[in-house]
Amino acid sequence: MSSDNQLNYGLDTDTIDIADSVIIDVATKTLGTIPGIHSLSPRFYDELVEGITHAFGQRSLPGINVKHRKDFIEINIYIKALYGYNLIELSKQLQSEIKQTLKNMLDLDHVKVDVHIEGIVKEKEPVLHGN
């Protein structure tokens, strides 16, 4: 992995670079396909942490971050779920869908997805950015 937060796949002399922002985009778009997820849940310190973690090879967006570990990529997702859904099943489905989408689109096999449920929302509550 290069120092600028990209995955590098060497094919003899050819190289393919995948930026962390692409991994975040794929994971974020996958969230919208799963019923029961209300929104990403940004934490109050996300912006402060972003500046610090970026210097150490980590990339994040409020509510989601990517960390490069020795043998795998770790994705932490902080969400608000809709009331009435089985939270364990919802989390497992989100983990599975993100892993499968990253495998299909980016050929990433070694991905750990941690889901953090930060709140429950009634279905009629609007999506508020930053809450």
PLM ranges: what are they?
Residues M1-L11, V121-N131:
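Short, charged, intrinsically disordered terminal tails
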Residues L40, F44-I79, E118-K122:
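Short edge beta-strands and adjacent turn/loop segments
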Residues L87-L106:
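Short, non-transmembrane amphipathic alpha-helical segments
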Residues N104-I120:
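A short amphipathic beta-strand at an alpha->beta junction
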